[in-house]
């Protein structure tokens, strides 16, 4: 390595430059680590699936809330259809109502956000039922598609059974 004879003159400048670079890198990394990603996923244009968040996704005009508690959201159309993430599963009539709400809102051109507490089980079940009906897909293909958009989707076993009943009823 070639070192200039007067390297001691440049040493403070080099040290300050390296320190400044380290500070910038640390701040950028800390910002990325601490910035929370939104707890929702775009399933397709105009259709979001997720968990509870302080604000619904951008441009959202309709919310279907499956949580046991109501939301503070102020959107054009809001439906609260609380269910527990446990057995027994709701019945097919309840599921038809939720799918009809999504269909109605999408037909009106509204962006729809379907959510439960974590965006995993209840909302995954309802979104799967909607897609199964619209696309005429079987349950497993629909869940595979949903997981490609939101990997954490895992409906409760009772909800999986309800989706099989839904598949056979359509």
PLM features: residue spans?
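N-terminal Lys/Arg-rich, disordered targeting/topogenic segments
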Residues: 1-8
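Hydrophobic membrane-insertion alpha-helices, especially the h-region
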Residues: 12-27
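Cysteine-based protein phosphatase catalytic domain of the PTP/DSP
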Residues: 32-113, 132-167
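Generic alpha-helix initiation/capping and coil-helix boundary signal
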Residues: 12-13, 121, 135
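Positively charged, low-complexity intrinsically disordered regions
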Residues: 9-10, 140
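Intrinsically disordered, low-complexity segments enriched in polar/charged small residues
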Residues: 14, 127, 152-155
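A phosphate-binding catalytic loop at a beta-strand-loop-alpha-helix junction
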Residues: 109-128
């Amino acid at each position: 390595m070639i070192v200039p004879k007067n390297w001691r003159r440049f040493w403070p400048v080099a040290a300050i430059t390296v320190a400044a670079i380290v500070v910038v890198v640390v701040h950028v990394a800390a910002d990325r680590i601490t910035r929370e990603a939104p707890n929702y996923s775009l399933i397709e244009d105009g259709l979001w699936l997720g968990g509870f968040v302080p604000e619904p996704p951008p441009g959202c005009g309709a919310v279907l809330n499956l949580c046991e508690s109501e939301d503070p959201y102020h959107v054009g159309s809001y439906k609260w259809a609380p269910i527990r993430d446990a057995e027994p599963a709701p019945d097919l009539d309840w599921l038809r109502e939720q799918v009809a709400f999504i269909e109605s809102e999408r037909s009106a051109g509204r962006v729809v956000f379907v959510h439960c507490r974590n965006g995993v089980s209840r909302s995954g079940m309802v979104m799967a039922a909607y897609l199964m009906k619209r696309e005429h897909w079987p349950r497993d293909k629909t869940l595979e598609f949903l997981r490609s958009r939101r990997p954490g989707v895992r409906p409760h076993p009772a909800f999986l059974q309800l989706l099989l009943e839904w598949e056979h009823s359509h």
